[in-house]
């Protein structure tokens, strides 16, 4: 029987405001426990929440970027539940009328197991503002749990999709695209290790695309793309095996154990009525006029999809290259700076180098591209020397770029080429003389080539490059050899 997987994601993106959503306390990460909790965060008597304008503007920014409707009037609600790290006994969230409604996000799903990749549009249900809870600390307290309220009141944007994804690969592609977008917009730092971006996955299975949805289980607080994929794949197998063995899937909340690579039951899954939502009487309705939306729209950066399309049309880049270069804002900025210095004619070469040598060296060094030792202008200088034939692409990769990366001669390609004596031979008369000598010394290879053995030609090219100590232009060597051998 062909089972279909149904997945929806709820993502909590911590908004990059300096202060909390309803108080003036700092949102900085890593402070000593309970040193960044204002009276509002502590739920002290008589204090009232004041909405952070910056959090609202970041929500509007996100809504505009995904083509959503921005609600002219939205309501904050109290989500009632008890937990030790929730001092008020309720969380301020949005329920019936969220600030962002609808929207879409187009994702690129990687091909796997010989299947091609594809593009898919995921529909979003909503994105709403809410406050984060505190944090329970279980380490260093013998038989007890500590409570840190520094995180309480931190502004979150909860982003909810429709159940549109049909595999773990699609869910990961969506999560990666969303992660890249919120960082591109500057509304979230995307630091998954610090909990700034975490996903809950709602997973169910059904007997084919026309069958009713199955009972879903929610897997909470997945803070890496690898964990997200592993958790979904395990949960899908668990549900299918359970049903095929005659059991029934129970609606519940589950946690993922990355060590055992399995999900386990945490609690029965609550429905909305369990939280007894009602409008927060301490907060007025949030009114967002067209002028405010237009003001935020004016600050929007060029979005990744639009920039990728521009790279394709302006520079003739393949779609794959354009999508890789616009995966992060820093990579796109680096590419554009290289092209600005090297010229549009070198755009494809710039893309190849950034996706190749630059990316591999960054990965080995554990660096982001904005910390690359080779600047865009320096890389453009190297590309210019390849383009004008001063050095070959191979010499650039093998000898010049590593020296630039190491900071030799201040990363100046020309100085490194001169110091190492890497300039290609430009005297065609001298090269022709060397090729004559190579042909005379390799009569057997000449005979084999004339007998139709193409490998013999490659051997002659190798001998010519060896004789010039790699300084000859390979294309010029090929051209002269063919001319001498009568194969041109």
Swiss-Prot record:
Q: What is its EC number?
A: 6.3.5.-
Q: Where does the secretion signal sit in this chain?
A: none
An example molecular function term from Gene Ontology annotations: asparaginyl-tRNA synthase (glutamine-hydrolyzing) activity
Which InterPro entries did the record assign?
A: Asn/Gln-tRNA_amidoTrfase_suB/E, Asn/Gln-tRNA_Trfase_suB/E_cat, Asn/Gln_amidotransferase, Asn/Gln_tRNA_amidoTrase-B-like, GatB, GatB_C_1, GatB_Yqey_C_2, Gln-tRNA_amidoTrfase_suB_CS
- Which Pfam family is an annotated match for this chain, by its short name? GatB_N
- SUPFAM superfamilies xref list: GatB/YqeY motif, Glutamine synthetase/guanido kinase
Spell out the PROSITE patterns in the cross-references. GATB (PS01234)
> Function of this protein?
Allows the formation of correctly charged Asn-tRNA(Asn) or Gln-tRNA(Gln) through the transamidation of misacylated Asp-tRNA(Asn) or Glu-tRNA(Gln) in organisms which lack either or both of asparaginyl-tRNA or glutaminyl-tRNA synthetases. The reaction takes place in the presence of glutamine and ATP through an activated phospho-Asp-tRNA(Asn) or phospho-Glu-tRNA(Gln).
Subunit-structure text: Heterotrimer of A, B and C subunits.
Protein name, entry field: Aspartyl/glutamyl-tRNA(Asn/Gln) amidotransferase subunit B
Natural source organism? Ralstonia nicotianae (strain ATCC BAA-1114 / GMI1000)
């Amino acid at each position: 029987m062909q089972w279909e997987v149904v997945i929806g994601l709820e993502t909590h993106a911590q908004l990059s405001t300096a202060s909390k959503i309803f108080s003036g306390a700092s949102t900085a990460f890593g402070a000593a426990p309970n040193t960044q909790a204002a009276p509002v965060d502590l739920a002290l008597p008589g204090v009232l929440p004041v909405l952070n304008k910056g959090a609202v503007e970041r929500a509007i920014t996100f809504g505009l970027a995904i083509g959503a409707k921005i609600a002219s009037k939205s309501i904050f609600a109290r989500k009632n539940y008890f937990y030790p790290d929730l001092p008020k006994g309720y969380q301020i969230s949005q329920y019936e009328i969220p600030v962002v409604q609808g929207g879409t996000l187009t994702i690129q799903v990687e091909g796997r197991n010989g299947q091609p990749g594809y593009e898919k549009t995921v529909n979003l249900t909503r994105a709403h503002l809410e406050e984060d809870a505190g944090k329970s600390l279980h380490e260093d307290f013998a038989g007890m749990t500590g409570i840190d309220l520094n995180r309480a009141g931190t502004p979150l944007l909860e982003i909810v999709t429709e159940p549109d994804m049909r595999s773990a690969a699609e869910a990961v592609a969506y999560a990666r695209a969303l992660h890249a977008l919120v960082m591109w917009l500057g509304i979230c730092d995307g630091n998954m290790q610090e909990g700034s971006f975490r996903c809950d996955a709602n997973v169910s299975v059904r007997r084919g695309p026309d069958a009713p949805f199955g009972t879903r289980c929610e897997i909470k607080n997945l803070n890496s793309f690898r964990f997200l994929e592993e958790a979904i794949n395990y949960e899908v197998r668990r549900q299918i095996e359970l049903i095929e063995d005659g059991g029934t899937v129970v609606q519940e909340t589950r946690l993922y154990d990355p060590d055992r690579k399995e999900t386990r039951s945490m609690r029965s899954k609550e429905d909305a009525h369990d939280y007894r939502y009602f409008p927060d009487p301490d907060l007025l309705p949030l009114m967002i006029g067209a002028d405010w939306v237009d003001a935020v729209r004016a600050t929007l950066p060029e979005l990744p999809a639009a920039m990728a399309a521009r790279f394709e049309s302006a520079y003739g880049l393949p779609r794959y290259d354009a999508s890789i270069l616009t995966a992060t804002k820093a990579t796109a900025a680096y590419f554009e700076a290289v092209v600005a210095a090297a010229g549009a004619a070198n755009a494809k070469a710039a893309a190849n180098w950034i996706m190749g040598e630059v990316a591999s060296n960054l990965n080995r060094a554990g660096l982001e591209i904005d910390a690359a030792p080779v600047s865009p202008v320096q890389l453009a200088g190297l590309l210019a020397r390849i383009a004008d034939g001063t050095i070959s692409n191979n010499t650039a990769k093998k000898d010049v770029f590593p020296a630039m990366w190491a900071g030799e001669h201040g990363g100046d390609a020309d100085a490194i080429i001169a110091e190492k004596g890497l300039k290609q031979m430009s005297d065609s008369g001298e090269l022709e003389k060397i090729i004559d000598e190579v042909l005379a010394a390799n009569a057997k290879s000449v005979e084999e080539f004339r007998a139709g053995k193409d490998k013999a030609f490659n051997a002659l090219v190798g001998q010519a490059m060896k004789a010039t100590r790699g300084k000859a232009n390979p294309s010029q060597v090929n051209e002269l050899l063919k001319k001498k051998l009568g194969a041109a």
